[in-house]
Amino acid sequence: MALTLFDTDEYRPPVWKSYLYQLQQEAPHPRRVTCTCEVENRPKYYGREYHGMISREETDQLLSVAEGSYLIRESQRQPGTYTLALRFGSQTRNFRLYYDGKHFVGEKRFESIHDLVTDGLITLYIETKAAEYIAKMTINPIYEHIGYTTLNREPAYKQHMAVLKETHDEKEATGQDGVSEKRLTSLVRRATLKENEQIPKYEKVHNFKVHTFRGPHWCEYCANFMWGLIAQGVKCADCGLNVHKQCSKMVPNDCKPDLKHVKKVYSCDLTTLVKAHITKRPMVVDMCIREIESRGLNSEGLYRVSGFSDLIEDVKMAFDRDGEKADISVNMYEDINIITGALKLYFRDLPIPLITYDAYPKFIESAKIMDPDEQLETLHEALRSLPPAHCETLRYLMAHLKRVTLHEKENLMSAENLGIVFGPTLMRSPELDPMAALNDIRYQRLVVELLIKNEDILF
């Protein structure tokens, strides 16, 4: 039966393209031209390939023996500087050579001259033979067909369905019905309804870093070989996607972080975290707010009173270590100020603030407007400029803080007081000038106060 399937199946060309790999195999090999006499003042980091201060004509003669021949000479025009002379394409190529603990002529740095020359010959050969091919590599990508997106779709879908099933089971267990829903305030009901919406598909740019691949590697965007000895391409630090540097410019903003690349919860980019864990908001925000609302809304000075810093650090480490399994219950942390402190610390530790640097000026400008209607309209526009994951988290936090103000008689925390606490926590000035940042503090407070008071209108 398997044979029949094979016979009737249509022919499909190989996914991975071998042309550039074959070219790398054909590239000239390095041939060191050694100096037969002892050279005075030879730098200790060069070997017998160093010939001292010889002329270009003598260099040409020494290298004419074969393609890939190389030597190092001291420049006659600029004594104290060194040149790597390399035979390629029946010509001598001269490159200014540098050393800072590693050898380099460009961006790449090498442990040995031999590796530098090997990589250089591969690059010269491929770029000479396949310049037109390389220029067109990105035209017909395989990325959307068999690449990263497809490979990650099934696990994400299964986990998402598990989340939806868990929500449904919780409803049945608690016996929710129309009567209980009517008893909810409109504020809480809206937040509850939004909780049950499907997890949105947030866009996230890939976090590409130059990477050295050990062994042959192929680009997961264009399917072509990634040539060279080191720094052959880039790798996404969040999802592990491997592509050519030029292909990285074409990859869509669809990074789906792998949990093995996301090592912690605190100090992690917010969008990266929610995509890695397939959640609407960071787990820290959801879990801390649930805990605070279950036992802390009447606590005097909620969010204003500081918790014990060592225990707040314990909560942080628990989230970094255990994620959503972190225990922040009353049995572990009786003082609710420890939980509020951990939540504030999460926002302070974000590398990109909840109200992002890009959106910051728009929020500050809205706070300066005197006309209330125009102010809200401008604030609404500012919210639209936030990344979706940031906006959703801000919405959830403001709905929570609005509920905190409903208990103001007991906890003494008004929208104004909460603005004082959360203004500098959620917003950080992109200005390096400390005086300019200091002048913005009152507007930061006002922004948060306005967001809390008008939460039902703005979100």
Curated annotation (Swiss-Prot):
It comes from the Eukaryota. PROSITE patterns: RHOGAP (PS50238), SH2 (PS50001), ZF_DAG_PE_1 (PS00479), ZF_DAG_PE_2 (PS50081). InterPro entries: C1-like_sf (IPR046349), Chimaerin_SH2 (IPR035840), CHN1/CHN2 (IPR017356), DAG/PE-bd (IPR020454), PE/DAG-bd (IPR002219), Rho-type_GAP (IPR051854), Rho_GTPase_activation_prot (IPR008936), RhoGAP_chimaerin (IPR037860). Residues 268-459 form the Rho-GAP domain. The record marks 304 as: Arginine finger. Pfam families: C1_1, RhoGAP, SH2. Residues 49-135 form the SH2 domain. The modification N-acetylalanine is found at residue 2. Transmembrane segments: none annotated. Phosphorylated. Phosphorylation is EPHA4 kinase activity-dependent. GO terms for molecular function: ephrin receptor binding; GTPase activator activity; zinc ion binding. A zinc finger (Phorbol-ester/DAG-type) spans 205-255. Disruption phenotype: Mice are viable and fertile but display a loss of coordination of limb movement which phenocopies the one of Epha4 mutant mice. Keywords: Acetylation, GTPase activation, Metal-binding, Neurogenesis, Phosphoprotein, SH2 domain, Zinc, Zinc-finger. This is N-chimaerin. It comes from Mus musculus (Mouse). The lineage of its organism: Eukaryota, Metazoa, Chordata, Craniata, Vertebrata.
